[in-house]
From Swiss-Prot:
It comes from Influenza A virus (strain A/Turkey/Ireland/1378/1983 H5N8). Residues 205-230 are annotated as: Disordered. This is Non-structural protein 1. Upon interferon induction, ISGylated via host HERC5; this results in the impairment of NS1 interaction with RNA targets due to its inability to form homodimers and to interact with host EIF2AK2/PKR. Gene3D superfamilies: Influenza virus non-structural protein, effector domain, S15/NS1, RNA-binding. A motif (Nuclear localization signal) lies at residues 34-38. One of its GO terms (molecular function) is protein serine/threonine kinase inhibitor activity.
Length: 230
């Protein structure tokens, strides 16, 4: 196993522990708590894949971080922070909408790269809105946190989420996954609307890169883009 993979996991475990202590003092905002919850799932998946114990990795990560901080002057730390672009966290969904459990009458699941696509094929003739929470850097998609499909009644009927055991995805991965979700939902004559946030950062207009957003074999009846509700 690559030593960098192990040490990266150890540092991530310790930094998650620090963030958890911060949240336990009720100091974190909603985006912070949401990332904390999702990163916990990711760490569990990575730990299982690597065969590493999280508690042991956390202790090792603490030693690595302490050693770095001892060697790092404050001036260098300030310069590093200033030179790194800060991501923006954009939200279509509330924390309740993101954490709500949902069930499928006719479940369908597909894995595309490091993204898992789930939808309920029992849904027919509905107006459906795609909403997402994501982070962007320099006006480009950095990470899709979660995408969900909602009916007008607020029922969740579809979802795209990163696989905890396979971190990392590109904006093209997200775009392709959205195409699969839309194609599956449109198959039952549902009408799909896309939030302004998704339209801008993950589901850009057709012909932008010389091809339509949906694969040729999928239906093309995208409804008008709606403005973000948040």
């Amino acid at each position: 196993m690559d030593s960098n993979t192990v040490s990266s996991f150890q540092v991530d475990c310790f930094l998650w522990h620090v963030r958890k202590r911060f949240a336990d003092q009720e100091l974190g905002d909603a985006p912070f708590l949401d990332r904390l919850r999702r990163d916990q799932k990711s760490l569990r998946g990575r730990g299982s894949t690597l065969g590493l114990d999280i508690e042991t990795a956390t202790r090792a990560g603490k030693q690595i971080v302490e050693r770095i901080l001892e060697e790092e002057p404050d001036e260098a730390l300030e310069m590093t922070i200033a030179s790194v672009p800060a991501p923006r966290y954009l939200t279509d969904m509330t924390l309740e909408e993101m954490s709500r459990d949902w069930f499928m009458l006719m479940p369908k699941q597909k894995v595309a790269g490091s993204l898992c696509i789930r939808m309920d094929q029992a849904i027919m003739d509905k107006n459906i809105t795609l909403k997402a929470n994501l982070s962007v850097i320099s006006d480009r998609l950095e990470t899709l946190i979660l995408l969900r499909a909602f009916t007008e009644e607020g029922t969740i009927v579809g979802e795209i989420s990163p696989l905890p055991s396979l971190p990392g995805h590109t904006d093209e991965d997200v775009k392709n996954a959205i195409g699969v979700l839309i194609g599956g939902l449109e198959w039952n004559d549902n009408t799909i609307r896309v939030s302004e946030t998704l339209q801008r950062f993950a589901w850009r207009s057709s012909n932008e890169n010389g091809r339509p957003p949906l694969p040729p074999k999928q239906k093309r009846k995208m409804a008008r883009t709606i403005e973000s509700e948040v």
